[in-house]
Amino acid sequence: DWRTARIEHAREVRDLLGGDYYVDYADDNFEDGKVVKLGDIIAYHNETTVDWLGGFVQANYTTDKLNLYGMGGISSIEYSYQDWFTVEQELVKADPIQTYQVKGGALYNVSDNLGVFINTGLVEKAPILDNVIDYSGNVATDPDNEKFLHNEVGVNFGTQKLGVRVSAYDTDWQDRNLTKSVSTGQGSSGDTDIIFLRGVNQKHQGLEVETKVKPNDMVELDFIASFGNWKFDGDAEGTYQENEYNDEGQVVGYTTTEYQYALNGLYVGDMPQTSYIVGLTVKPVKGLRLQALYKTYDKNYSDW
């Protein structure tokens, strides 16, 4: 499977707010500023490309009681960056980044009603372009791939009137690359600074329960519960990118500072770690389905 993308990034003048022109200082090819009008490009103008090549194989083995599944894959991604607002307009290319993934699972049917299963997988994800080539055209040396190591075990039980699935999981998410925005209120439009984080590790553990009760053909009762414990595992390094402004409040460059970010032990935010769902479905006549759901969420920590 081969895919390619070419993306142009630019900001365009759409409204002069009654003026005849605007002076932009972002283009280094115009030392004293560039007079722009409607439709002209300001602030930034660059082009990036992404080339992706990958493939995978999979296999499945089934008997009366046992089902085995496995797959393996490899991919390569290559980035380039060209800034039209620099004098050199150099085409910057990063070396191809290889990633791998291996997944496997097994289901054993103890009886007609009871089955146990296990799933495991190791997946790598290449860092995004922003973490490989920055706005100045600097290329990161040997950037780390994100890694997901996931293990899950569980049991299925089912009859004509009752179905139950219980599973426990443990996931190590290593070497994440995150981008965070910090509102500064500076500049002509209240621009934001950016933090590029490297080496962010998280551990996700939890238990999930799904139950379906069907006392007759007209009524179904569903109960789903999920109990998670997701935390950051260790601190991380980060580059703080701070915009620089001229007297008119326009961005004319930026400075970067390296920091250590104390993340160890913080809960992962912006997603509930505990949830309950109760549902009632009624089918009074053929073709008509009435459903009521009650959902509640807990341990939903704020992001940072």
Q: Language model features by range: what are they?
A:
Residues 1, 68-72, 102, 116-118, ...:
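Transmembrane beta-strands of outer-membrane beta-barrel proteins
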Residues 2, 109-121, 144-236:
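Membrane-embedded beta-barrel scaffold of Gram-negative outer-membrane proteins
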Residues 2-111, 133, 237:
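Signature of Gram-negative outer-membrane beta-barrel scaffolds
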Residues 3-41, 136-142, 180-196, 242-260:
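Surface-exposed loop/turn segments flanking beta-strands in extracellular/periplasmic regions
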Residues 51-57, 100-104, 149-153, 164, ...:
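Hydrophobic, lipid-facing positions within transmembrane beta-strands of outer-membrane proteins
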Residues 62-65, 170-172, 196-303:
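Gram-negative outer-membrane beta-barrel transporters
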